[in-house]
A protein has these predicted regions:
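Membrane-interface amphipathic segments in extracytoplasmic regions
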Residues: 1-267
């Protein structure tokens, strides 16, 4: 495939993270193991600041979430580099460019669970208002509430694009313009470790992968019926077209997952 970088590509991916010592560019995608990969690259670079992590923990920011703070991960943000250096990072054969992908249905559910169901700080109010909870006997039906989200984002994807958790992965990676040396699929066994090995070899380190920010443990087959899965797959059709994800095989005409009283109280 030929990669045709447009003049504004550095602006489109200016959230990319640069590890200058080991010459790695990482383009993070929300809800695609980005906490784990930021920590891996930060530690391999020797930039991780554990003291800063302790200083910024609050009731709304857990230890695991601190890795998203630039003081903690210590990596250079692409937008902080001069234009000439940005293009060197993007095009030079001396640099390793990496990214990760995730099954669109699993990513959509994970984003919704975190941003909408659990009301993560910073979630736009306009999105929360479009996705109110569905209750059964005073308790949230997670499957029905997620279906409501699937219908809303399918109807008006632009309204959700103000939050990068809900944008297609293609619109984050710009894979037709930027050549990646490692573009892993985190749902495929072993691919995360393969990337970790490549980064450790490059850095001369032995950093271990750490799984961070896991969700509520709800499985896809508890949530997706055929209609919901079709809506999400159509909403993120670019990701299927560009990255070759397998189509879903959910066939149930409906599904329901009502929280028990203890779960409802915790929510």
């Amino acid at each position: 495939m030929d990669f045709l970088a447009q003049p504004n590509l550095p602006d489109l991916i200016n959230y990319g993270l640069v590890a200058p010592r080991i010459k790695v560019l990482y383009i993070p995608t929300t809800k695609v193991a980005c906490s784990t990969l930021k920590l891996l690259i930060s530690q391999a670079e020797g930039a991780y600041n554990a003291q800063a992590a302790q200083e910024i923990i609050t009731p709304n920011i857990s230890q695991e979430q601190t890795i998203h703070n630039y003081r903690v991960h210590g990596l250079t943000r692409l937008f902080d580099l001069p234009r000439k250096e940005q293009w060197e990072v993007i095009e030079s054969s001396e640099w390793m460019r990496v990214a990760a992908l995730r099954d669109p249905l699993k990513r959509a559910y994970s984003s919704w669970e975190n941003r909408i169901l659990l009301r993560a700080p910073g979630t736009p109010q306009s999105i929360l208002e479009m996705c109110g909870d569905v209750f059964v006997d005073g308790r949230v039906d997670v499957a029905a509430t997620f279906k409501k989200f699937a219908q809303a984002i399918h109807h008006d994807r632009v309204a959700f694009a103000i939050d990068d958790h809900f944008r297609p992965q293609f619109n984050t990676l710009y894979a037709n313009q930027l050549e990646y040396h490692h573009r892993i699929y985190i749902d495929r066994p072993g691919e995360m470790q393969t990337l970790a090995d490549a980064i450790n070899e490059r850095a001369g380190t032995s950093v271990k992968l750490q799984r961070l920010n896991s969700g509520l443990g709800i499985k896809a087959d508890q949530i997706f019926d055929k209609e919901t899965a079709d809506l999400i797959a159509d909403t993120y059709h670019e990701d299927y077209e560009w990255f070759g994800f397998e189509r879903h095989n959910f066939t149930a005409p409906s599904t329901s997952l009502v929280l028990n009283p203890i779960q409802q109280a915790l929510l």
